[in-house]
């Protein structure tokens, strides 16, 4: 499975959310998106759940959050 990387660290809201949504819209059936953010995006996680995406979250050693997202 190929991964589309969206690194939105260091951006001011709402740009990280907008980049995440753009990445989701471009996500193919057999692709995974790796989203890297400065903080846990709780509103985005609710949208992912509502829209049926599979996602996992992990904190990196540098404090950033990695979210792996794919279509169900």
Positions of PLM-derived features:
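C-terminal edge-of-domain segments
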Residues: 52-72
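Short, structured protein-protein interaction patches enriched in aromatics and acidic/basic residues
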Residues: 34-54
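Residues that cap or initiate secondary-structure elements
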Residues: 12, 41, 61-63
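An N-terminal amphipathic alpha-helical segment
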Residues: 1-28
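Beta-strand secondary-structure signal
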Residues: 5, 34, 66-68
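Sterically constrained small-residue positions within well-ordered secondary structures
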Residues: 26, 46, 58-60
């Amino acid at each position: 499975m190929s991964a589309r990387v969206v690194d939105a660290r260091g951006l001011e809201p709402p740009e990280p959310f907008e980049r995440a949504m753009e990445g989701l819209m471009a996500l193919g059936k057999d692709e995974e998106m790796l989203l890297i953010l400065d903080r846990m995006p709780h509103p985005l996680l609710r949208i992912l759940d509502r829209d049926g995406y599979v996602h996992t979250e992990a904190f990196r050693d540098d404090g950033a959050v990695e979210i792996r997202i794919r279509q169900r």
